[in-house]
């Protein structure tokens, strides 16, 4: 712990904690904060001016990052017959129906994303209590309940990021790796922020994005200029 605290203190000296950075400058700065032996994830944290306790202020959706996430994603699909074949041909790692649900009931969930066709959501409901807490429950809002399983598999494999505001109004997401180029990170962050702005609830009042910051897996955070983010449409 002492080593980690010392490293964070050293990295913090590279950041002006009183400054809100333009996105371009923030990306330059976080690239200097790399300290781990692995390829750290670039993470964004947003504080939104919403109260998700009210259904009309929920912010939830998905977006495909243009440069991907840098992470290999294992995709499972619950489908039958032609749709099962479609999923396999699209590159799904696991495809099944009753058999896959049985594996989930046993706790065997060797996948990062679960997609299902609408007609089989009754079957998926049997394992909702297992999938829900892990954030794996298929949902139409994230494009994971669909008859177009091929497109859903492609999106998941291409770097789709799902987002959902928590009870405090926060959204966190990994938007690539520190090894990505500045341009790739810019494209990913701006695409993600545009999606957040697009999902602004009509009931949201005042300044929609209150605070924002970028960080690496093992680094302190760099504050972002919120007005620049609000202008991303």
UniProtKB/Swiss-Prot annotation:
Gene3D superfamilies: 3.30.190.20, 3.40.50.790. Coiled coil: none annotated. It holds the Pfam family Ribosomal_L1. InterPro entries: Ribosom_uL1_bac-type (IPR005878), Ribosomal_uL1 (IPR002143), Ribosomal_uL1-like (IPR023674), Ribosomal_uL1/biogenesis (IPR028364), Ribosomal_uL1_3-a/b-sand (IPR016095), Ribosomal_uL1_CS (IPR023673). One of its GO terms (molecular function) is tRNA binding. One of its GO terms (cellular component) is cytosolic large ribosomal subunit. GO terms for biological process: regulation of translation; translation. Keywords: Repressor, Ribonucleoprotein, Ribosomal protein, RNA-binding, rRNA-binding, Translation regulation, tRNA-binding. Binds directly to 23S rRNA. The L1 stalk is quite mobile in the ribosome, and is involved in E site tRNA release. Protein L1 is also a translational repressor protein, it controls the translation of the L11 operon by binding to its mRNA. Part of the 50S ribosomal subunit. HAMAP family: Ribosomal_uL1_B. Belongs to the universal ribosomal protein uL1 family. This is Large ribosomal subunit protein uL1. It comes from Campylobacter jejuni subsp. jejuni serotype O:2 (strain ATCC 700819 / NCTC 11168). The gene is rplA.
């Amino acid at each position: 712990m002492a080593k980690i605290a010392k490293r964070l203190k050293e990295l913090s000296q590279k950041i002006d904690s009183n400054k809100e950075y333009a996105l371009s400058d923030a990306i330059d700065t976080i690239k200097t904060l790399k300290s781990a032996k692995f390829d750290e994830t670039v993470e964004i944290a947003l504080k939104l001016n919403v109260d998700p306790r009210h259904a009309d202020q929920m912010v939830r959706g998905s977006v495909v990052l243009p440069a991907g996430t840098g992470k290999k994603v294992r995709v499972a699909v619950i489908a039958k017959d032609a749709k099962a074949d479609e999923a396999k041909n699209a590159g799904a790692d696991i495809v099944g129906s009753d058999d896959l649900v049985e594996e989930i009931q046993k706790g065997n969930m060797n996948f990062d994303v679960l997609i299902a066709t609408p007609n089989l959501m009754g079957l998926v409901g049997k394992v909702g209590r297992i999938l829900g807490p892990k954030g794996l429950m298929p949902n139409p809002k994230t494009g994971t309940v669909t008859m177009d399983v091929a497109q859903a598999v492609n999106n998941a494999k291409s770097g789709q990021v799902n987002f959902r505001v928590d009870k405090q109004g926060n959204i966190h997401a990994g938007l690539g790796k520190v090894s990505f180029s500045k341009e790739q990170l810019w494209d990913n962050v701006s695409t993600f922020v545009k999606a957040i702005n697009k999902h602004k609830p009509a009931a949201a009042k005042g300044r929609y994005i209150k605070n924002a910051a970028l960080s690496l897996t093992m680094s302190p955070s760099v504050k972002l200029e919120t007005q620049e983010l609000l202008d991303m449409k």
